[in-house]
Structure formats: C-alpha cells, structure tokens
Regions:
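ATP-dependent adenylation/nucleotidyltransferase module used to activate substrates
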Residues: 1-201
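Charge-dense, low-complexity polyampholytic segments
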Residues: 132, 202, 206-209, 239-246
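Short amphipathic alpha-helical surface patches that serve as generic macromolecular interface elements
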Residues: 152, 184-187, 205-208, 221-224, ...
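Immediate flanking context of iron-sulfur cluster ligation sites
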Residues: 197-222
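Iron-sulfur (Fe-S) cluster-binding segments and ferredoxin-like electron-carrier domains
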Residues: 215-246
Length: 246
C-alpha cells in the first residue's frame, strides 16, 4: 500500500510477532500492537510482551500496546491450549498429527477481524492509510488452516467488501512464505538497521516466550511443538537462544 506508515499488528509476545514488530519499526512505521487474552494456559507471553514494549518505548520508538480480553469468546474452545481444558499439550514436531489438538478454533481470523476494525477506525480518524499484519509463517501452514495464504487472502477480501472505507486499509503477512529461521534473521536484521547493539537484541529475544508448557519459574520445556520449532530456528540461524530452558 502506497503512502502508508501506520500498522496494526497482532503481538502475542512470541518470537514470530516480535520479529514482525521489529520489521515494521525498522521501516519507520507507527505501530499499534494488540495482544489477546483468550484464556490460554499461562500468561507468560503477555507479561513478556509488556517488558519488550517498555524497552522499545524507552528507546523512543513509536509503538503502543493494548491487551484485549477474549476469554468469553473462546470459552467453548476444545483446544489443548485453552486453560480450562485438562487435555495434555502434545510434545514433538508440528508436522505430527497429534499437534492438531493445539488448534484454537478460528483464532487468527478473529484476531484479524478485530485488528481490521481497529485499523479502519484509525484510518477514518486520521484520513490516512493503515495496514494490518500478522506474523504467520510457512511453518504454521501444516497444522493451522487459518494461517495459509488461501485463508488470509479470503479474509482480506471478506473484510474489504464488508466495510465502507476499506480502500484505506490493507492486509499483509510479510512472513507468510518464510520459515522460522528466516523470520528470525529478518527480525534481527531489522534491529541492526535501527542501531540495536548485541545487548539490545538479546534483551528483545529474552523478552519473547514460545513454550506451551513452561515450568513454575517460566522456563521453557524444550519438548513441545513450538519449543522444537524455536530451537531449530535458532540453530539454523547460527544463533544462541537466550531464554532459559528446563
């Protein structure tokens, strides 16, 4: 989208969405970020993301943050990620069939719809163009149908035809064809473009959380699907993951 320097992003506090945030900040965007409390089994990500936002704001970067409560909206979820369910979260690679239990019904489409409304309001108030963006990537497609390019394309068209003023809002997912190691190096590269030192980059990465089953001290298990994928990404990127593991 031309003449656009505003973006609304979904910021879970995980690695993918945090690298998405760096991507836009490095390009000079004003970022409004949104985290969603949908009743997940722990809130470590939500705490970590606040640490990163504070760190970035203290650097004078144009980012705001809001946590949106969606617990009631997801109260009937059958996902193993939902806190009220007793189902054990499976271990192993995302490509394995049992990982389907971690799918949260329609989650990314719901998040996108809320962000589209936020972006449209921002666009109308400022008479400017606004993007919405998610940090979904190629590794998500195997298990999460609402992260595929086809799903995202259809959602984009649905939002466009369902609202007046949609010419001011566009939807993009810049990492949709990248694997996790590629988005990691993209995000780190963005931080270096902004003049971040190694210690700054380590702070940002330390303030991300991916694990589905952390211990009581917040350490990652290293065995669940998202831990396996994260560790693999750091290895392929020839980087050390700074977060603590059990």
């Amino acid at each position: 989208m031309e003449n656009c320097n505003k973006v609304c992003i979904s910021l879970s506090g995980g690695l993918d969405s945090t690298m998405l945030l760096m991507h836009y900040l490095a390009r000079g965007f004003e970022v409004r970020s949104y985290s969603f409390d949908y009743g997940q089994k722990h809130d470590i990500e939500l705490k970590k993301v606040k640490d990163n936002i504070k760190f970035l704001q203290e650097k004078g970067l144009p980012v705001s943050h809001q946590v949106i409560n969606l617990r009631d909206a997801f109260s009937d979820s059958a996902s193993s990620l939902y806190g009220a369910n007793n189902e054990k979260i499976p271990e192993g690679d995302y490509r394995e069939e049992n990982m389907k239990s971690t799918v949260v019904e329609n989650r990314n489409v719901i998040f996108s719809s809320i962000m589209y409304g936020k972006a449209l309001g921002w666009a109308n108030k400022t008479q400017s163009n606004v993007l919405i963006s998610l940090g979904i990537h190629a590794g998500d497609h195997t298990i999460y149908p609402d992260t595929t390019p086809e799903s995202q394309s259809m959602a984009r068209e649905l939002f466009r035809i369902s609202n007046w003023g949609s010419e001011r809002v566009d939807y993009e997912a810049p990492f949709v064809n990248l694997h996790k190691d590629e988005l990691l190096t993209t995000g780190v590269g963005a931080m270096r473009l902004m003049g971040f030192q190694d210690s700054d980059i380590e702070t940002v990465l330390t303030n991300t959380h991916s694990c589905y089953t952390p211990d009581s001290e917040g350490r990652s298990c290293g065995k669940c699907g998202t831990c396996v994928e994260r560790l693999e990404a750091f290895e392929k990127a020839h980087m050390m993951d700074p977060i603590p593991y059990i």
